[in-house]
Amino acid sequence: MVTGNMLWSGEDKAMVASVLGKEAFEYLMSGSVSAECSLMAIGNDQNLQNKLSDLVERPNAANFSWNYAIFWQISRSKSGELVLGWGDGCCREPKEAEEREVKKILNLRLDDEGQQRMRKRVLQKLHMLFGGTDEDNYAFGLDRVTDTEMFFLASMYFSFPRGEGGPGKCFGSGKYLWLSDALTSNLDYCARSFLAKSAGMQTIALIPTDVGVVELGSVRSIPESLELLQNIKSCFSSFLSLVRDKQAAGIAAVPEKNEGNNPRLSNSGAVTERTDGNPKIFGHDLNSGTHFREKLAVRKAEERPWDMYQNGNRMPFVNARNGLNPASWAQFSNVKLGKPVELYAPPTPGHNLMNGGREEFRLNNFQHQKPAARMQIDFTGATSRTIVSPAHNVESEHSDVEASCKEDRAGPVDEKRPRKRGRKPANGREEPLNHVEAERQRREKLNQRFYALRAVVPNISKMDKASLLGDAIAYITELQKKLRDMESERELRLGSTSRDAITSEDSPSSEIQIRGPDINIEAANDEVIVRVSCSLETHPLSRIIQIFKEAQINVVESKLSAGNGTVYHTFVIKSSGSEQLTKEKLLAAFSSESNSLRQLSPKLHKVILPSLF
């Protein structure tokens, strides 16, 4: 089977099916959306990553945060088909307490080296299948792929036409889905159910908005919360849908209910039950100056290298967060790709909004537009960028939207940059995700440290990291023991006298004043007698005298003579032991001294030994 310019053998198919699950593998291979068709998002919320990160990385008042958050965005394939494609996402690894909770229900398998190789191989094949190249294949740089990362990274390659898969069905019906027991339930909410269960996800929530579907997951079992659903829907809906929500809040105070008591969240983004004030999520005001609220602006849509159609014309789509209503699925489904298309707002009276009527933006050709009524944005040569401050009421917000869309200023033409085909992991980012890339770099740095440690440890029992750390600890302990032994031996060689001298020098209360040598000169007849006296500590032969004392040998007489450049010092000693024993004792004493004394000892022996025998 040739798919995506790759030949997949039966072994490759079995490997991919074992990692992704049979249903997910068949879904990707079924060709619901051609693997060779890149997707272009209709609208590009530049603040989307921050919103998803807050849901995952910032716990709420109850110290809860989701394990992953994905936004499935309305996208258009190269063939013009409208699908829900990967918009952006964020994930984190389960905490220790969360893992214990999952293990009670699901026996998590241990990832061996073979399983890791299979996961990396599957990610590489998926990357190539969807038009990627070896140069930008991030799977080659992954050290280890966890269950959560495998589920998250594999999800990037899925897309859902209307009515297919969990996100497609949810968006088509306008009804949310909340599963609190996904691990034990037999319901497969999506083709990715096998991957979600492998990652230990107990709670799965799919929340439709007017621009896509928000998918949330947690390894904890979370009860359904209507307030949380409304907050998330308000946060991820387009700006104009929030304006309509404020109008609807003054009319309908009771939420509309569907069959089965399941509150319906309409595709238009209207939430029928709202409280007074601005919508909030996790305590953040959506209409305040926080990062949840982006300034209203009209920007040039990003040009894609593949958006040239049969007649050479381009299909522009405006930013969903820039004040223009992103078209719903039904609005884009009947668009003909023959002529350039623009979005404009018909002159709708203000009372229509107050009566609950929906303000729609229609698709039409340029030749049918009236200059006074159209809201035109030229995506080919100029860009309009009018910034409007956040409004405080419905009337001012509506007027600000119209004003921002009518004022156009000429801008520089953006330089076209060639892009590689294939689906990027997120909107305009080369890395799969910031936190995934950071984790990969941390592991690479840790591995480099282990490689360096392995190079300096001489004896390695096993090649795994735990054994390497144990061997390194044993080696360091051995080196410390050798150091202590060498220090002890050095202290013994210094001798007890040196230690006593060092101790006396360190103690301020026992300072010894070392006197210089006393010189006495006497003249008698024709001779001059010179006597030099000094303390034993300062005498050059003090160590020899000390050796005699330690050997219990008395010095009877000492003679000094000089000749031929050599000084001879002769000692006449007396010992209580035998002559042979005295000789051996002196030889042993002199041999234990420093190198200088050992070099001097043979000469002394020649002087001393004849005096003994």
Curated annotation (Swiss-Prot):
Factors inducing expression: Induced by wounding, feeding with herbivorous insects, infection with the fungal pathogen Botrytis cinerea and infection with the bacterial pathogen Pseudomonas syringae pv tomato DC3000.
PROSITE patterns linked to this entry: BHLH
Compositional bias ranges of the Polar residues kind: 260-270, 495-512
GO cellular component: nucleus
Region (Disordered): 256-285, 391-441, 490-513
UniProt entry keywords in alphabetical sequence: Jasmonic acid signaling pathway, Nucleus, Plant defense, Transcription, Transcription regulation
GO annotation terms (biological process): defense response; regulation of defense response; regulation of DNA-templated transcription; regulation of jasmonic acid mediated signaling pathway
Family matches, as SUPFAM superfamilies: HLH, helix-loop-helix DNA-binding domain
Function: Transcription factor that negatively regulates jasmonate (JA) signaling. Negatively regulates JA-dependent response to wounding, JA-induced expression of defense genes, JA-dependent responses against herbivorous insects, and JA-dependent resistance against Botrytis cinerea infection. Plays a positive role in resistance against the bacterial pathogen Pseudomonas syringae pv tomato DC3000.
Subunit structure: Interacts with MYC2 (via N-terminus). MTB1 competes with MED25 for binding to MYC2. Interacts (via N-terminus) with JAZ7.
Protein name, per record: Transcription factor MTB1
Organism: Solanum lycopersicum
Lineage: Eukaryota, Viridiplantae, Streptophyta, Embryophyta, Tracheophyta
